[in-house]
Each structure stands twice: as structure tokens, then as C-alpha cells.
């Protein structure tokens, strides 16, 4: 059956700020306490969505989550009216207010792991929201993520939306940022590739400086609940040294699409064995793996982390050629820019490079790949998505005007204490649910 890969980008929320919450994420730590521009952030992401939609790619949008999270703050012991809760948190524990106010759900690569119907035992598209249990500000996302996915992908004939795995370190799950899929064609059975940072119950190398957020046990559990064939599921360990260099998810050091793996030479432990396993598995599915390995001598791990070369989108055009979507920081790094010029001029599958200004997201450690969740849908499955979430001229104009009406153009850490920010955010989100036709999605609407 004909199928297409859709990208569902997260719309940046009104509380986008730089609180430095993500240990192991170099950009997040380096920009802590800077002033952010939520309006610019949202518009940068929206423009990327629109340009890709204009190029013929299936492009959807996922709404922001409600922030600040009053539920979290009340759970942590702050009481009173909403304004009182925010004031108390700001005075007594500003770091907790920052966690409750994070707009990190914009990075939908961490929202869930998705397996298309061609790969699953029951022939449905399966979603497992990521528990993101390694960081407080992200661990509060999965319930709202499940509600959103269950709203958009509501037909049980076509879709299965699971609950997140239990939020324990042994099952630390960071979603699609550590998962990719290889196939001959999107609608045919493929190979699902899970990358983990450490294993809880068996010995192996681990990073020493920064935490490994994804466990083997979590990856395996997701594969099992999605009903994936064992012979079509491959696991690999990320090199702990690159985690210590700031590669906190695999999508900061490699990206895959269809028959192509674009990766840094230092991405994996026992890389040749991984390449061989992937090659054999994909060969059984009727395709030949094409590995584009970037040598450390051309692009160092530090270059990769600062430019986010691999936190790119690798997209297939209708004619089979591939385009690489990168942040503008790739053009500002001489080594990376030179490599991309050689890549596009070569005879490989990647023929074009598209460059986007995503500066606001990048300063928090999120490039093009972080902002999108890949969902392969056949024609019947796409028709079952009835919400108004597919980017076109009309929706783009509505969302662009909505951002103008509701978003601030400056938000510093101290502004999180402003009780008006909660009211502004709720007003914006209430209107957004009408634009997207997703019903009463948020707690404050119920």
C-alpha cells in the first residue's frame, strides 16, 4: 500500500526560555539565564514546517503543552490560588518553577517512538510516549503527549497509543531521538533501529561525565509492545565517549532514512558489527544499506555538537533523491560547511542541503531533527487523522497570526514569576485548540 513519511513538528510554546535545565546538553548549559524570544522561536519553527510542506513533504504540527505546569507545582507542595503557587515557587524554589515552565515538549523527537503498520504484528501504527525520566522538566510531558497522540490518532482500527514505560532509570526512554527505520519503501516492512546509551542489567561501557539517558531495556520493551519481528529489529550502543562530549541523544550524531544511514565515524560501539547486522537485515527486506560515514578528520565530534550537523532531517523526494535539512549553524562552521559542499556535489543519495534559521531552538540544544516526530502513514491512516494539523497556506496563516497575537518577544528567567504569563499561555492555547480542532485538550479546559 502507498505510504508516506509525515513529520509532525512541535509548535514552540509561549514560555520558551533558557533555564539551563538539561545536564549533558551543552547548548542548554551554555545559554542558561539568557533572554529568549518565544515569538521568534515559534515563527522559526513554523517557517520550517511551511517550507517543507511547500516542497511536497507531508508536514503536521503538534500543539504545545500547558506551561507553567500548576499540577507539578502543587504536587511539589506549593498551594493557594494559581498566582500564589507561582509566587511561592518563584521565591522558594525558582529552579522548580523553571522546570514547570519549560517549553521542551516542542522537541517532538522525544515525544514518542513510532512504528508503522507495515512493521507491527497487528498491522496498526504504534506509539509509545517516552517517559523522559532522566529530567524533571521532561518527565512531566508523557501524559499530555499521550492525550495529544490519542486525539490525533484516535481510530483504534489504525492506531495504538500506549502509555509510557514506567519512569525508572532502568527503563529510561527518550523516544524517537534514539530510533530510526530503514526500508526499501515506506509502505513495505522495514528494519527498526534502536540506539541506547547503557544497559541496566548487563555489563558494558558507560559514559563518565554525562548521563546515558536511554537504556537497552527500554528500547527492547518498546520493540516488544509494538509487536516488531525479532529479525527486523536491531539494537546498537552509542559510544559513551561521544555522550561525554555532549551527544545526549543519538540524533545528535547520526540520522537515517529509507536505505541511508548518515553518521559520524565515532557514533557507535562496535560500529562495523552494527553496519553488518543492519546490512543483512535490510537485504532480507529487499534493500541495500548505504552508509555515509563522516570521518572525524573532516568533522570532529565537537564540530558535530556545535553545528548539529547530524541533528538534521533526511527526507526522500518523490523521485527517490534525498535532501538534508540542517540548521544555519552548519554554514557557520567552516569544517561542516566544507563537508556539506562536498556531500551535495558527490554521487551519493543526498543531492541537496536546505538550511534553516532555528537559532532560538538551537540555543537550547534542539535542531531540525529534535523538532519533528516521524510517522509513516498509508493513505487510509492519513485519512483517519481528522484534526486540522496538516500544514497548508490556510493553517500557516492562522498559526502565524495566532503567534503574533499571543507571544512575547522577550522572556528572561525572572519573567517566569509573572502570573500574567500563565493567563497569556492559557488564552493562547484555548484559541489554538479551536484552530487545530482538537477539542478540550488541556486540563484547564476540562
UniProtKB/Swiss-Prot annotation:
User: What does the record list as GO biological process?
Assistant: arginine catabolic process to glutamate; arginine catabolic process to succinate
**What Gene Ontology terms describe what this protein does at the molecular function level?**
N-succinylarginine dihydrolase activity
Note the subunit structure: Homodimer.
The cross-references to SUPFAM superfamilies, in alphabetical order and at most eight, read: Pentein
| PANTHER family, per database record | N-SUCCINYLARGININE DIHYDROLASE
Pathway it works in: Amino-acid degradation; L-arginine degradation via AST pathway; L-glutamate and succinate from L-arginine: step 2/5
* Protein species of origin: Burkholderia orbicola (strain MC0-3)
What lineage is on file? Bacteria, Pseudomonadati, Pseudomonadota, Betaproteobacteria, Burkholderiales
Q: What does this protein do?
A: Catalyzes the hydrolysis of N(2)-succinylarginine into N(2)-succinylornithine, ammonia and CO(2).
Family (UniProt): Belongs to the succinylarginine dihydrolase family.
- Residue sites binding substrate per the record: 19-28, 110, 137-138, 213, 251, 364
Q: Which reaction does it catalyse?
A: N(2)-succinyl-L-arginine + 2 H2O + 2 H(+) = N(2)-succinyl-L-ornithine + 2 NH4(+) + CO2
Disulphide linkage map: none
Q: Which UniProt keywords apply?
A: Arginine metabolism, Hydrolase
**Entry EC no(s):** 3.5.3.23
The name this protein carries in UniProt is N-succinylarginine dihydrolase
Task: Tell me which InterPro entries the record gives.
Answer: AstB_sf, SuccinylArg_d-Hdrlase_AstB
A Pfam family: AstB
Please list the residues that make up the active site.
174, 249, 370
- Designated gene of the protein: astB
